[in-house]
């Protein structure tokens, strides 16, 4: 695979290899055949980052070969959304001959939605001044005149200039209901929107007969918490990043959801609070004992769950675990399988044509 060519004819074969690999990895814990969720074969990534290469008068996006580290010119990127591809051409055309915008520009980041909104961030090795703001405003207005719903941001050391806003609002159809998700520039969002919809619908399906409340660790902008709220009496969720917490609070209001509570704290801190080890001012006014959480949802970073969180989640009758790294999932399962069995297993092809796998497991207490 190269940035400008996707081996779409190999999609089914690479997916079958992932299914076999996941099934083999999970064999010590489950004999289940994974439920498989396919990605679109192209235009599936909703965000992308590119370095910029200045070559005389020419200017273009580049990526680096992971093996050789050599640079690769990228004029089109079929893995990314159609909107990103349109913006890539428009940004180069708008920046190439404008000194204020081009000088010391080294990277452009694109974030888009299925609702055809975009935030484009321009990263510089220089101080951004009023001349830059005026030039960027003119570029933004020209892009909008082309029918592009885009917001521009300038970034430099200790500097961030928003011409109007640093977020976009995604709208996803999830099991018959439209969900609104505010996505903030430079914060985590699910890269493959079509796959995100399938993950949300799978999580809804496997928790449809739930009793009691849901606890979620690492909730981000509320992606899973808000979709799952319809299956539970109440949802209590934690997140450490301030922009994500703010986006989650907006999303709660935008989706008219009244049974989700977001707490800004790390999963490790929440574990300490639940175990009575420490008290936190952020939990004032929240009676943790009031929640009857029968299900816990975790979507941890690639490092998986730490040992203390492993012990904490074992106290719940059901554990819903979304993993972006099956190796650390299996490491966690060495502990979790002592008290729980794997009752559902899914493979989500979040990153086609790569070795990366996203998977989900539902664990029920023995």
Swiss-Prot record:
InterPro entries: MeTrfase_TrmA_AS, MeTrfase_TrmA_CS, SAM-dependent_MTases_sf, TrmA_MeTrfase, U5_MeTrfase_fam
Active-site residues, Swiss-Prot/TrEMBL: 324 (nucleophile), 358 (proton acceptor)
Enzyme class, spelled out: transferase
Signal sequence coordinates: none
Keywords on record: Methyltransferase, S-adenosyl-L-methionine, Transferase, tRNA processing
Enzyme Commission no: 2.1.1.-, 2.1.1.35
Gene3D superfamilies: 2.40.50.1070, Vaccinia Virus protein VP39
UniProt binding sites for S-adenosyl-L-methionine: 190, 218, 223, 239, 299
Induction info: Growth rate-dependent regulation of transcription. Is a novel example of a mRNA regulated through a mechanism similar to that of a stable RNA (rRNA).
CDD domains with a match to the protein in the record: AdoMet_MTases (cd02440)
Superkingdom of origin: Bacteria
Swiss-Prot/TrEMBL catalytic activity: uridine(54) in tRNA + S-adenosyl-L-methionine = 5-methyluridine(54) in tRNA + S-adenosyl-L-homocysteine + H(+); uridine(341) in tmRNA + S-adenosyl-L-methionine = 5-methyluridine(341) in tmRNA + S-adenosyl-L-homocysteine + H(+)
Pfam families noted in UniProt: tRNA_U5-meth_tr (PF05958)
Function: Catalyzes the formation of 5-methyl-uridine at position 54 (m5U54) in all tRNAs. Dual-specificity methyltransferase that catalyzes the formation of 5-methyluridine at position 54 (m5U54) in all tRNAs, and that of position 341 (m5U341) in tmRNA (transfer-mRNA).
Family assignment from sequence similarity: Belongs to the class I-like SAM-binding methyltransferase superfamily. RNA M5U methyltransferase family. TrmA subfamily.
Protein name: tRNA/tmRNA (uracil-C(5))-methyltransferase
Gene: trmA
């Amino acid at each position: 695979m190269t940035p400008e060519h996707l081996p779409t004819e190999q999609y089914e074969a690479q997916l079958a290899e992932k299914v076999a690999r996941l099934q083999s990895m999970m064999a010590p814990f489950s004999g289940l055949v994974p439920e498989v969720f396919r990605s679109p074969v192209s235009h599936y990534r909703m965000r992308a980052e590119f370095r910029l290469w200045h070559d005389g008068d020419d200017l273009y996006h580049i990526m680096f070969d992971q093996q050789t580290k050599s640079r690769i010119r990228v004029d089109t990127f079929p893995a990314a959304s159609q909107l990103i591809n349109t913006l890539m051409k428009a940004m180069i055309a708008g920046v190439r001959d404008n000194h204020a915008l081009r000088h010391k520009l080294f990277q452009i980041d694109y974030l888009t939605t299925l609702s055809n909104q975009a935030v484009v961030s321009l990263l510089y090795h220089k101080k951004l001044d009023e001349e830059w703001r005026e030039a960027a405003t003119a570029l933004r207005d020209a892009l909008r005149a082309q029918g592009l719903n885009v917001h521009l941001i300038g970034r430099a050391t200790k500097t961030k200039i928003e011409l109007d806003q640093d977020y976009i609002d995604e709208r996803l159809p999830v099991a018959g209901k439209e969900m609104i998700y505010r996505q903030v520039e430079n914060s985590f969002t699910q890269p493959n929107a079509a796959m995100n919809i399938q993950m949300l619908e799978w999580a809804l399906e496997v928790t449809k007969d739930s009793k009691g409340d849901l606890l979620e660790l690492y909730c981000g902008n509320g992606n899973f918490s808000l979709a799952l709220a319809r299956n539970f009496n109440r949802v209590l969720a934690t997140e450490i990043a301030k922009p994500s917490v703010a986006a989650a609070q907006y999303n709660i209001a935008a989706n008219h959801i009244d049974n989700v509570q977001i707490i800004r704290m790390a999963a490790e801190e929440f574990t300490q609070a639940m175990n009575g080890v420490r008290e936190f001012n952020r939990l004032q006014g929240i009676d943790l004992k009031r929640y009857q959480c029968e299900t816990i949802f975790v979507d941890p970073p690639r490092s998986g769950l730490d040992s203390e969180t492993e012990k904490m989640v074992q106290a719940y009758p059901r554990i819903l675990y979304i993993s972006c790294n099956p190796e650390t999932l299996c490491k966690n399962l060495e502990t979790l399988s002592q008290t729980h069995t794997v009752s559902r297993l899914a493979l989500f092809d979040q990153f086609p044509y790569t070795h990366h796998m996203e998977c989900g497991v539902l664990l029920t207490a023995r």
